[in-house]
């Protein structure tokens, strides 16, 4: 079927898409007559006995916002926000006389439409599913569609309208003094230093669950620890020089002028911090440019053409504020550490080389050994496993269910501290998860597998309206 109804927008976050799925497994939960545990799109979901094997459903990941129209048309807002539901009048008429019935006529979503991780009878439920027929209540034109042919399709737009997106808490006023500074900087005349094709952001790391079949059992994989900090990129690449008046005149009359030079560029996950030459340095989250602080230390060790991608953890420089609450990773108060996890090298012909995990690790170890002053600033990648995927759990049969079995073993592997406390931290926090890469892959990519305990902690922080530095940088 040619699908032009369910589409992915240009700015979509691939980890927060709705997916059309088929239920192919259900395991009865202990101490419950009506609840089942099912693995849907690679995630653990608790479902009721209203669902059955082979049902086609619509799945939404945790921390996704579902559009208000869909929630309203399906009466999915909670009793506290029932005024947003289509059946408002009916519920309002019986709300006081029969509160139990009124509650049965509504859902459990708050006004923000956020999908929250739930824990029932000791089991986590990682997302929200509904019947595929509910789409027709949202849009009548979706009634007579062959959904069998669309199983596995992911999307964030329906008929060109935004349907779901990543949830980000509203920033508290006390945390956003940088906005005024950014507005002022936009008014300044700026010189763009960036040479095309020299700088690249890090690729999006996809959730492993929905993509588990992309892992070939025979592939050489690396498994590394996922740290909970903020992403950073440090490059020594060709940049444009700001020409002197004399050089501008020479250039105007056709004389050769060297317009490029190697220069340091540093960035957060999505914002290049020193792309422009301005009269003022931009402020950042919490009022401190933590990426700039790290750049001051690491830049001089990066050779021409190299870009280092990594994670900054610990504390904001000279501050008692943590980059991520309680995730100290052994840092003393006021100090940070930087862990490189990816390195690329670009030559004079713009040909880019991707380093494998072992080369990244060796470069980091060499940097620390040759420069002891960096011992408390730079931390090496924590490689947990390197080898054929099929050799990690040799007791798993290489059958049609290998991928599903492999995923389930990874989720609870205590050798990787999955669902255990993070041993790298002094504070008691769960490990965030692991990252998997395929060595000598056709193109650079990686998959992440987060722990359920981390999802739960993240949800609690969102409930309190706490903003993650990674979500606004």
Predicted regions span which residues?
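Core nucleotide-handling region used for phosphoryl-transfer chemistry
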Residues: 2-473
């Amino acid at each position: 079927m040619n699908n032009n109804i369910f589409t992915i927008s240009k700015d979509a976050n691939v980890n927060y898409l709705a997916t059309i799925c088929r239920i192919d497994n259900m395991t009865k939960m202990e101490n419950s007559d009506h609840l089942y545990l099912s693995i849907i799109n690679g995630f653990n979901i608790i479902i009721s006995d209203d669902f059955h094997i082979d049902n086609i459903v619509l799945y939404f990941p945790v921390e996704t916002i579902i559009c208000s129209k869909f929630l309203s048309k399906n009466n999915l807002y909670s009793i506290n926000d029932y005024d947003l539901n289509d059946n408002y009048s009916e519920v309002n008429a019986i709300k006081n006389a029969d509160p139990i019935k009124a509650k049965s006529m509504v859902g459990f979503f708050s006004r923000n439409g956020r999908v929250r991780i739930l824990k029932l009878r000791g089991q986590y439920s990682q997302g929200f599913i509904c019947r595929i027929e509910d789409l027709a209540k949202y849009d009548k034109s979706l009634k007579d569609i062959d959904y069998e042919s669309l199983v596995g399709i992911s999307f964030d737009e329906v008929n060109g309208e935004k349907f779901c997106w990543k949830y980000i808490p509203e920033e508290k006023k006390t945390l956003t003094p940088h906005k005024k500074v950014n507005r002022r900087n936009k008014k300044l005349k700026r010189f763009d230093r960036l040479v095309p094709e020299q700088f690249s952001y890090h690729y999006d790391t996809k959730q492993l669950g929905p993509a588990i079949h992309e892992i070939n059992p025979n592939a050489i994989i690396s498994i590394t620890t996922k740290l909970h900090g903020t992403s950073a990129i440090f490059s020594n690449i060709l940049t444009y020089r700001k020409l002197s008046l004399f050089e501008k005149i020479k250039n105007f009359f056709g004389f050769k002028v060297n317009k490029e030079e190697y220069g340091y560029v540093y960035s957060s996950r999505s914002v290049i911090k020193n792309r422009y030459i301005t009269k003022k340095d931009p402020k950042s989250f919490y009022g401190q440019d933590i990426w700039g602080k790290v750049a001051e230390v690491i830049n001089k060790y990066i050779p021409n053409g190299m870009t280092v991608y990594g994670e900054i953890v610990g504390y904001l420089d000279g501050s008692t504020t943590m980059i991520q609450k309680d995730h100290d990773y052994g840092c003393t108060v006021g100090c940070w550490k930087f862990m490189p996890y990816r390195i690329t090298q670009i030559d004079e012909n713009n040909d880019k080389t991707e380093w494998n995990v072992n080369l990244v690790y060796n470069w980091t170890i060499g940097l620390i050994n040759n420069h002891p002053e960096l011992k408390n600033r730079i931390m090496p990648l924590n490689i947990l496993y390197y080898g054929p995927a099929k050799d990690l759990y040799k007791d798993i049969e290489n059958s049609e269910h290998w991928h599903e079995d492999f995923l389930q073993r990874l989720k609870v592997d205590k050798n990787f501290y999955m669902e255990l406390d993070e041993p790298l931290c002094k504070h008691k926090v769960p490990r965030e998860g692991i990252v998997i890469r395929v060595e000598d892959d056709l193109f650079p990519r990686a998959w992440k597998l987060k722990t359920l305990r981390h999802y739960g902690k993240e949800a609690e922080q969102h409930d309190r309206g706490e903003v993650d530095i990674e979500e606004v940088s």
